[in-house]
Amino acid sequence: MLKEVEAVRYDRKMRNGKTTPFLMACEKETGDEVELVAKFSKGCEDHCGGLICEAISAALAKDLGLPIPCPYVVNISPEFIATVAEPADRMFLEQSCSKGFGSERLPDSYSTWVSPSGKISDSLLASARSVIAFDSLFVNPDRRAENPNLMFNGRQIAVIDHEMALRQDMILFWKAPWTSGAFESPSSLEKHLLYRITKGSVLSDFNEFLQKLAMITDARIEEYASAIPID
C-alpha cells in the first residue's frame, strides 16, 4: 500500500513531464532514504484530483502485478520548501498541496519505450498484455506514441504517469470496456502504444491478470482510499 515519506533533499526539475515532476530524496519511517520522481498538485490539470487518480491507479497496478515503480505519498514541509534554491521551483511547491505523489526512480538503464524489432520474449509479452488490459479497464488514455509513459531497458517495461486514469468523464463518447462497441470510440484500443505487439491475443492470455483482478475485494479498494491523505 502507499507509504508516506518526507522530502529531505531537492535535486532538480526533471527534463520531461507535463506535470513538472521533480527529482528528490525522501526519508522513510525507517530512516532510510529513497530517490523519487515526485509530482505535485500545481502541475496537474485537475490539481489534487490528478494526484488522487495517480495514487489509486498505482496501488491497483501493484496489486495486479504490473511493472510499476514503487509508489509513495510525499510530504513537503515549509522547512523543506525553503531549502529549494531555484525561486520558480520553490514557488511551484509553495502553491501545491502539502502532499504529492512519488515514484521510485528507475535505474538509468531504462529509457522511453521503443518497440523491439526482433522476437518479443514471453515475459515481455505477458507484461504488455497486463498493461493494455489495465489501461482499457481503468480508463487510461495516456499511453500512446506521442506520449508513451512507458519505460524499457531492453528486457523489461515499467509503467509511469497515471493521473489521467479513472477519468472516463474526460473522454468523449466513452463506453465501458465490457460493452459492445467500446473500442470503436475515439479512445480506441488500436491507438494504444502496445496494441501492435499484443494484437492477436485471446481471452485465455489474460487469465493471470483476471485472476489477480478477482482477488481485489471491496475492502481492498477501501484501503486504497484510506491511504490517500485527507489534507
Report the location of each language-model feature:
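Conserved ATP-binding subdomain of kinase catalytic cores across diverse folds
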Residues: 1-114, 137-141, 154-155, 162
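A short, terminal or domain-edge coil/loop segment
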Residues: 19-21, 121-134, 195-206
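Short, low-complexity, polar/charged sequence segments that are solvent-exposed and flexible
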Residues: 55-59, 89-90, 120-125, 171, ...
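Glycine-rich loops and low-complexity Gly/Arg-rich segments
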Residues: 61-65, 93-98, 126-130, 158, ...
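A general structural signal for short secondary-structure boundary/capping elements
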Residues: 69-71, 145-150, 204-208
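Short, structured coil/loop segments at alpha-helix boundaries
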Residues: 82-89, 93, 117-125, 186-187, ...
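Conserved kinase catalytic-core segment
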Residues: 109-171
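C-terminal catalytic region of ATP-dependent kinase domains
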Residues: 153-231
